[in-house]
């Protein structure tokens, strides 16, 4: 049995798995009698993975009611159908419901009924056209190839178009298989990717500026892969190259890292978001904080080895790895050459000024802030939040911290 056959055996749902989800979905559909409601997403397309226990049901309203109706009245109407069930309100471009039936999570999403993908007013409006396109272009073998590619992307950490991941959506994964024909062919081509990569199932109707460009076949004005970052594309390309040379289950099911040696000084910024907010909104702010802190800490003279973040919409950890947290209290401040117009300002603003052998002015300056002070002054979220700082002083069992310390993905070596 090949690795791909073994993986497929583990990830392909059985008839019993499918029937279980279909029965739960029918409970919701029965509650939506009178509405134009349909199952969408990977379950409908037959590309879902064993263990996935969520289903998308879209409820389509006339286009004439507009986006504001979806945000306000549509949600209230839908809630009336599920008051006696366990549900919660979630948020994307507009609110939707997550209804729990036993252990199955069912997203009930209001959308507008349109004639073509190009008429979409909200992102959800295109979904049925995505579903129809994929179903019409994939047979049973093609659906299995999608499953393999999904599991591969999950294993190397680049599956998901959300801001937290900045990776490949399920739809883009399906389009890659439709374009190249098989899992192995996708990897063979991905191993040669050089950005910008263009994969055109349809001629685009506008120019795109992204590492990966996949015009949406149902709306060619849209780049379906706009979420994919350069890092995610690079990870996919390198993982594809290495897998083709030396296949391993580690690409699909990576082993958890053991305890790692602490190299340098590690500061953990543990953030607690006190308000319920859309995960994409939180993670947009997380990555902006990461970039800002890296810049400010480096500017203060600390050498940053690495900085990253992990967590969810409520609990986030920002890991900062420094060569050393102990650096001099004073530092050399390099000024302008003696003949430049801002020499006078430099002299007035600094003490201990001298002229160097190179004709530049120099001074000695006291460092203004420690790393902790930089974080205290600059960490920010629009939502109410609290945080605590922890210097890592001993090895721990936390898999995310150990992954941050190890750096190297298990499939890379």
Curated annotation (Swiss-Prot):
Keyword DNA repair tagged: no
Catalytic activity: a tRNA precursor + 2 CTP + ATP = a tRNA with a 3' CCA end + 3 diphosphate; a tRNA with a 3' CCA end + 2 CTP + ATP = a tRNA with a 3' CCACCA end + 3 diphosphate
Pfam families per the UniProt record, alphabetical: CAA_C, NTP_transf_2, tRNA_NucTransf2
Record EC number: 2.7.7.72
Superkingdom of source: Archaea
Residues bound to Mg(2+): 54, 56, 107
Cofactor(s) listed: Mg(2+)
One GO biological process term: RNA repair
UniProt KW keywords: ATP-binding, Magnesium, Metal-binding, Nucleotide-binding, Nucleotidyltransferase, RNA repair, RNA-binding, Transferase, tRNA processing
Keyword Magnesium: yes
GO MF annotation list: ATP binding; CCA tRNA nucleotidyltransferase activity; magnesium ion binding; tRNA binding
Binding-site positions, CTP: 42, 45, 130, 150, 159
Alphabetized InterPro entries for the sequence: CAA_C, CCA-adding_arc, CCA_tRNA_nucleotrans_2, NT_2-5OAS_ClassI-CCAase, NT_sf, NuclTrfase_I-like_C, Polymerase_NTP_transf_dom, tRNA_NucTransf2
Gene3D superfamilies: Beta Polymerase, domain 2, CCA tRNA nucleotidyltransferase, domain 2, Poly(A) polymerase predicted RNA binding domain
Function: Catalyzes the addition and repair of the essential 3'-terminal CCA sequence in tRNAs without using a nucleic acid template. Adds these three nucleotides in the order of C, C, and A to the tRNA nucleotide-73, using CTP and ATP as substrates and producing inorganic pyrophosphate. tRNA 3'-terminal CCA addition is required both for tRNA processing and repair. Also involved in tRNA surveillance by mediating tandem CCA addition to generate a CCACCA at the 3' terminus of unstable tRNAs. While stable tRNAs receive only 3'-terminal CCA, unstable tRNAs are marked with CCACCA and rapidly degraded.
Summary of subunit composition and partner proteins: Homodimer.
Xref: PANTHER family: CCA-ADDING ENZYME
Note: A single active site specifically recognizes both ATP and CTP and is responsible for their addition.
Protein name: CCA-adding enzyme
Native source organism of the sequence: Sulfurisphaera tokodaii (strain DSM 16993 / JCM 10545 / NBRC 100140 / 7)
Gene: cca
